[in-house]
Curated annotation (Swiss-Prot):
GO MF annotation list: metal ion binding; ubiquinol-cytochrome-c reductase activity
Similarity comment text for this entry: Belongs to the cytochrome b family.
Names of the cofactor(s): heme b
The protein, known as: Cytochrome b
UniProt organism field: Urocitellus washingtoni (Washington ground squirrel)
Length: 379
C-alpha cells in the first residue's frame, strides 16, 4: 500500500521538500543555515505578531507602548528581546549562508541565487523599518538619515523623500506606514522563500566539492533532519543566552531616550548588521556616489555568477581563491568596525581603503586569481 505522504496532495509537497528529498551525502554544517533562517523567520513572525497586539504606531504612544510591553505584558520583555535579538541571529545566519554560497560556488544556480539576493534586500528593508518602530532617538534619527539618502537621486529625489515621509519630516505618517510595511514584508519574504526553495529543488543542493552528486544521494530524512535539529538547538541556545543574559548587548543606549527631533545624537549609526554598508556609504564624500556604493555593495552579489571564471565550481581545491575569500571576510569585519566609529582620522581613511579593497577583491582580484589557478592546472 502506498504511503499517504506519497499520495496526499499536501503531504506530497512536504514529502518531496523535507522527507524523501535526495540530498548529497557530503554536505557539511555550512548547509545548516537554510533551515536556521527558516526558523529565524518563524520566530520573528511569531514574536512580531504578539508584539503587534500591544504596540501602537503613533508618535505620541509608540515609545510608551514598547515600555508597556516590557513592564506590564506577561513575558512581554521576553517577546520583545527575542524579537530584537532574533533579528541579529537572523543576520548572522544570513551572512554565513551567503558566505557559504560564495565559497562553494552555489551562485551558479542563477535563479536560486538571485532570489536569495532579493530576499537579502527584503530582510534588510524589514529590519530597518522595524528599528524605527520603538521611536527612540536612534530610531528617529536613523530613519531621518537613511530615508534622506534618497534625496540624492537627481530631479525626483526631494519629492520622493517627502512622499515616503508623508510630510516634510519623519513624523506620525512615516511611523504608521513603516509599521504597516514591517508587518506585511515578512509574509512576502516567506512567499519568496518558497520560490527560493522551488528553484533549489529543481537542481538539487550543491556540495562542498562542487562536483555533481547525482550518483551519491541520500534521503533528507532522517539524515539531515537530525543534523538540522542540532543546528536548531545551538541557535536557540545562543539566542536565549543573549536574550536572558545581555539583551541590550547589540542595541544602542540612545534608543532608551524617546525620539526628539530637536536634539541630534552625537553619533548616528544603524544596528551592527548594517555597519559594513554604512561604512561604504560614509567613505565616499559625494552624496549620490555614497548611495550608489551602498546599493552596489549588496547588488554586487548578483554579479558573482558572471565573474566566475574558474573551471572549478567550489573553492575547496583552490588555495589562492580561498586566501582572497578570507581577506574579503576580514575586510567586511573591518568595515563593520569602521561603521560604528566616529567620522574622524584615522577611521575615515581606513574606511575608504577597506571600501576600495571590498570592490577590488570582488570585481578584479577574485576573477584574476581564478584564471591564474586555471593556468596552474593547465586548463
Amino acid at each position: 500500500m502506498t504511503k499517504t505522504r506519497k499520495t496526499h496532495p499536501l503531504x506530497k509537497i512536504i514529502n518531496h521538500s523535507f522527507i524523501d528529498l535526495p540530498a548529497p551525502s557530503n554536505i557539511s554544517a555550512w548547509w545548516n543555515f537554510g533551515s536556521l533562517l527558516g526558523l529565524c523567520l518563524a520566530i520573528q513572525i511569531l514574536t512580531g505578531l504578539f508584539l503587534a497586539m500591544h504596540y501602537t504606531s503613533d508618535t505620541m504612544t509608540a515609545f510608551s507602548s514598547v515600555t508597556h510591553i516590557c513592564r506590564d505584558v506577561n513575558y512581554g520583555w521576553l517577546i520583545r528581546y527575542m524579537h530584537a535579538n532574533g533579528a541579529s541571529m537572523f543576520f548572522i545566519c544570513l551572512f554565513l549562508h551567503v558566505g557559504r554560497g560564495l565559497y562553494y560556488g552555489s551562485y551558479t544556480y542563477f535563479e536560486t541565487w538571485n532570489i536569495g539576493v532579493i530576499l537579502l534586500f527584503a530582510v534588510m528593508a524589514t529590519a530597518f523599518m522595524g528599528y524605527v518602530l520603538p521611536w527612540g532617538q536612534m530610531s528617529f534619527w536613523g530613519a531621518t538619515v537613511i530615508t534622506n539618502l534618497l534625496s540624492a537621486i537627481p530631479y525626483i529625489g526631494t519629492t520622493l523623500v517627502e512622499w515616503i515621509w508623508g510630510g516634510f519630516s519623519v513624523d506620525k505618517a512615516t511611523l504608521t506606514r513603516f509599521f504597516a510595511f514591517h508587518f506585511v514584508l515578512p509574509f512576502i519574504i516567506a512567499a519568496l522563500v518558497m520560490v527560493h526553495l522551488l528553484f533549489l529543488h529543481e537542481t538539487g543542493s550543491n556540495n562542498p566539492s562542487g562536483l555533481i552528486s547525482d550518483s551519491d544521494k541520500i534521503p533528507f530524512h532522517p539524515y539531515y533532519t537530525i543534523k538540522d535539529i542540532l543546528g536548531v538547538l545551538l541557535l536557540i541556545s545562543a539566542l536565549m543566552t543573549l536574550v536572558l543574559f545581555s539583551p541590550d548587548l547589540l542595541g544602542d543606549p540612545d534608543n532608551y531616550t524617546p525620539a526628539n527631533p530637536l536634539s541630534t545624537p552625537p553619533h548616528i549609526k544603524p544596528e551592527w548588521y548594517f555597519l559594513f554598508a554604512y561604512a561604504i556609504l560614509r567613505s565616499i564624500p559625494n552624496k549620490l556616489g555614497g548611495v550608489l556604493a551602498l546599493v552596489f555593495s549588496i547588488l554586487i552579489l548578483m554579479l558573482f555568477p558572471l565573474l566566475h571564471l574558474s573551471k572549478q565550481r567550489s573553492m575547496m581545491f583552490r588555495p589562492l581563491s580561498q586566501c582572497m575569500f578570507w581577506i574579503l571576510v576580514a575586510d567586511l569585519f573591518t568595515l563593520t568596525w569602521i561603521g560604528g566609529q566616529p567620522v574622524e582620522y584615522p577611521f575615515v581613511i581606513i574606511g575608504q581603503l577597506a571600501s576600495i579593497l571590498y570592490f577590488t577583491i570582488i570585481l578584479l582580484i577574485l576573477p584574476t586569481v581564478s584564471l591564474i589557478e586555471n593556468k596552474l592546472l593547465k586548463w
